[in-house]
Amino acid sequence: MLELKFVRNNPDIVGRALVNRNMGTELIDSLLEYDVAWRKCLTEGDSLKHKRNVVTREIAQLKKENKDTLSKINEMQDINNRIKEIDDKIRDYKSKINEIMLSIPNIPSETTPVGKDENDNPVVRVVGEKKKFTFTPKPHWEIGEALDILDFERGAKIAGQGFTVYKGLGAKLERALINFMLDVHTRQGYLEVFPPVLINEKAMTGTGQLPKFKEDMYLCCADGYYLAPTAEVPVTNLFMDEYMENLPVSLTAYTACFRREAGKHGQDTRGIIRQHQFNKVELVKFVKPETSYEELEKLTLDAEEILKLLKLPYRLVTLCTGDLGFSAAKTYDIEVWVPTQEKYREISSCSNFENFQARRANIRFRTPEGPQFVHTLNGSGLAVGRTVVAILENYQREDGSVEIPEVLRPYMGGVEEIREE
């Protein structure tokens, strides 16, 4: 969340940021209108309360002198009624201001390129060579079904479209990737945590999922809990309403993730690229403001390391303003090569939120000058299902079998390949 004082004093900067994000400036216009009315009511309320104090003293003096107090008591009643009206307006305006403030996205960093959509995302680097097949490669869903390691029909039978059952070596591959990723990241210095995946509304608001993305979340209506859309939410909120010590703090976590938007608008309706339930390993950092962009580079390299070890070709792009997430100031997307689609697909987003999430979640640290909000960062390290997609497609052989990347074999009990039985 932005600071109200900053928005009030810099409407042009905030308005330009919204325009660069392909948004209008109506939110800012409404906010400033409510802000003026709110502050006017505060001033009027203070004046009335001062007047009430004066009348209170006058009534006391009249009583002391045994004089009639009826007119002053009536005046006091009128003042109290007016104060109640003003206080109601103050609460109403403040509620409207808070609602708008929670709906204003972060301001893109100066190094975030201005652009309309993903077509304007500049490529930072390309790593690894795309495999040249001597045969026509098959899409991962055909491979998964032929090898009997992915069962889309039974997943749909149990829960509906957008859910998949992993079987046999498919399930083992998914589990192997989770353990492999966590081992790599803990060696990189991240502390592993295993958080809840049922999240309360306050925590969801703290990281920016609410109120904007409420329709994309799964809600347990009876209890008011949301299913975690990403481990970013519970891990970041571990320090909600706290002062942090010994920054930076680096955490990694595996969780199942749940999102309602899978397959929206007809995208990726086949396979496991977009699912309502999927596994992900997350990286989260809490850092001092002056080091946050250096830490973003480190976090991104830490996520990239997984693909390097798996020997999967990928590229790194910087998201432009029109493609930037709601809470982010700057984001790198890591995109893995998917041969049958002949394009790179996002497998991780690594973002610096500056103090946007910390202000919402009230996560601070102490300095000699006074409390400051920390900067938060996170990135997928990686999306596990999409890594399975990349392995099945990039490591497939002409006979239909799939080679297991060498670094995963110890996690697979020595299995070197998956082939049809």
From Swiss-Prot:
Specify where it is mainly localized.
cytoplasm
Top EC class, one word = ligase
**For binding ATP, which residues are annotated in this chain's numbering?**
259-261, 346-349
What subcellular compartments does it reside in? Cytoplasm
- Where does this protein act, in terms of pathway? Aminoacyl-tRNA biosynthesis; selenocysteinyl-tRNA(Sec) biosynthesis; L-seryl-tRNA(Sec) from L-serine and tRNA(Sec): step 1/1
The residues that the entry says bind L-serine are 230-232, 282, 380
> Which GO BP terms apply?
selenocysteine biosynthetic process; seryl-tRNA aminoacylation
GO CC, any one term: cytoplasm
* Keywords, alphabetical: Aminoacyl-tRNA synthetase, ATP-binding, Cytoplasm, Ligase, Nucleotide-binding, Protein biosynthesis
Q: What's its EC?
A: 6.1.1.11
The record lists the catalysed reaction(s) as: tRNA(Ser) + L-serine + ATP = L-seryl-tRNA(Ser) + AMP + diphosphate + H(+); tRNA(Sec) + L-serine + ATP = L-seryl-tRNA(Sec) + AMP + diphosphate + H(+)
GO MF term list: ATP binding; serine-tRNA ligase activity
Instruction: Tell me the superkingdom of the source.
Output: Archaea
Pfam families reported in the protein's UniProt record: Seryl_tRNA_N, tRNA-synt_2b
Annotated coiled-coil positions are none
**HAMAP family per UniProt:** Ser_tRNA_synth_type1
Domain remark from Swiss-Prot or TrEMBL: Consists of two distinct domains, a catalytic core and a N-terminal extension that is involved in tRNA binding.
Biological function = Catalyzes the attachment of serine to tRNA(Ser). Is also able to aminoacylate tRNA(Sec) with serine, to form the misacylated tRNA L-seryl-tRNA(Sec), which will be further converted into selenocysteinyl-tRNA(Sec).
Question: How is the subunit organization of this protein annotated in UniProt?
Answer: Homodimer. The tRNA molecule binds across the dimer.
Query: What protein family does this chain belong to?
Result: Belongs to the class-II aminoacyl-tRNA synthetase family. Type-1 seryl-tRNA synthetase subfamily.
Q: What is this protein called?
A: Serine--tRNA ligase
